[in-house]
Amino acid sequence: MAAEPKESPSNNPGLHTTPDEATKGYIMQQTMFRIKDPKVSLDFYSRVLGMSLLKRLDFPEMKFSLYFMGYENTAEAPSNPIDKVVWTFSQKATIELTHNWGTESDPEFKGYHNGNSEPRGFGHIGVTVDDTYKACERFQNLGVEFVKKPEDGKMKGIAFIKDPDGYWIEIFDRKTIGNVTQTAA
């Protein structure tokens, strides 16, 4: 008799296999990072990771700005500002960079907790690239800080880099992620 797949409800107590009809249109839309300096973060996410700025929203009365970054084709975005907001919020897997005004020039500002030191919480986001090793060579040449290079550790072929605020980003490609996870699959 064949073993139940790891994803089956019998192997995952609490798992509901038939989503509630009310959740049919839900998507994973964004992860939010608080950033110290938008100039530095926008450079990293656009130049280093190749993302586009999908939409910027400024809230002067609350003194913060939101920058929505992603891999969408911005030429497809509507030109009407409100329609562009709706378009942005309908895209899958975007990064919302939240800048509280003044942090970039505040010498007392210590930065944000990235979740990877005690107390641990949030860990990282992941970006699929064409070739992990080539991408990491490029990141190295751009001066990006590494947490783990693809040749390090037991999980060969995946890397972790840091963004300017210390958030971790896992870097992998379709081939190496299959090799790395084959014994766990």
Swiss-Prot record:
InterPro entries: Glyas_Bleomycin-R_OHBP_Dase, Glyas_Fos-R_dOase_dom, Glyoxalase_1, Glyoxalase_1_CS, VOC. PROSITE patterns: GLYOXALASE_I_1 (PS00934), GLYOXALASE_I_2 (PS00935), VOC (PS51819). Pathway: Secondary metabolite metabolism; methylglyoxal degradation; (R)-lactate from methylglyoxal: step 1/2. Keywords: Lyase, Metal-binding, Zinc. Residues 1-21 are annotated as: Disordered. The keyword Metal-binding applies. The keyword Signal does not apply. Disulfide bonds: none annotated. The active site is at residue 170. Signal peptide: none annotated. It comes from the Eukaryota. It catalyses: (R)-S-lactoylglutathione = methylglyoxal + glutathione. Binds 3 zinc ions per subunit, but unlike the enzyme from mammals, shows full activity in the absence of metal ions. Substrate binds at residues 30, 34, 100, 120, 124, 154-155. GO terms for molecular function: lactoylglutathione lyase activity; metal ion binding. Zn(2+) binds at residues 30, 96, 124, 170. Zinc ions may be required for the correct assembly of the enzyme but are not required for catalysis. Belongs to the glyoxalase I family. NCBIfam families: glyox_I. Homodimer. Catalyzes the conversion of hemimercaptal, formed from methylglyoxal and glutathione, to S-lactoylglutathione. Active toward the hemithioacetal adducts formed by reacting methylglyoxal or phenylglyoxal with glutathione, homoglutathione or gamma-glutamylcysteine, showing no preference for homoglutathione adducts over glutathione adducts. This is Lactoylglutathione lyase. The lineage of its organism: Eukaryota, Viridiplantae, Streptophyta, Embryophyta, Tracheophyta.
